[in-house]
């Protein structure tokens, strides 16, 4: 009986180890954290390096339409985001390997964002973030931000953060 349990355990666990999902998902999870740390530190070079060289597909939390952004340089990011400051926290991150070269990450992002137009003290959004493996490593290919204010229909409570 003991031998049967051990054999069945290997049958269930071995495919996950064999295809590298665990290490891939951990790698991408760290890149998510690295990106937002770079954002908070105005490290445009790191942010640009984490973007796909063939561009990204984006939908921002400001309600703008889906858009494509071509290859973005550190200078481009500084020109568009210079003067902003942020203190953002990634909450409840998950990474899911969809194939050998595509990983879905999803998480909540909350914190404070400021620019010349003012400060958002309660920035909260959901992020669906697609990473692809390119020659130079894992890169952001697409992301969608959806604000968590939900039109006033939902009041956040502690149960929103409880595990099932």
Name every feature range the model reports, one short phrase each.
Residues 83, 111-121, 149:
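Short, cysteine-centered beta-strand-loop-beta hairpins and adjacent loop/turn segments enriched
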Residues 16-50, 158-164:
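Short, low-complexity N-terminal intrinsically disordered segments enriched in polar/charged residues
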């Amino acid at each position: 009986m003991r031998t049967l349990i051990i054999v069945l355990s290997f049958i269930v666990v071995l495919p996950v180890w064999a295809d590298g999902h665990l290490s891939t998902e951990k790698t991408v999870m760290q890149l998510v954290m690295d990106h937002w740390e770079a954002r908070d530190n105005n490290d445009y070079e790191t942010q640009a390096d984490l973007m796909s060289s063939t561009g990204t597909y984006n939908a921002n939390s400001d309600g703008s339409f889906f858009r494509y952004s071509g290859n973005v340089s550190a200078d481009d990011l500084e020109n568009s985001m210079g003067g902003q400051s942020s203190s953002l926290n990634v909450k409840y991150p998950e990474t899911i390997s969809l194939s050998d070269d595509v990983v879905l990450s999803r998480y909540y992002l909350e914190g404070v964002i400021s620019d010349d137009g003012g400060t958002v003290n309660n920035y909260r959004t959901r992020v669906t973030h697609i990473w692809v493996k390119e020659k130079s490593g894992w890169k952001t290919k697409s992301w969608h931000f959806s604000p968590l204010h939900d039109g006033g229909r939902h009041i956040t409570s502690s149960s929103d953060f409880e595990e099932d």
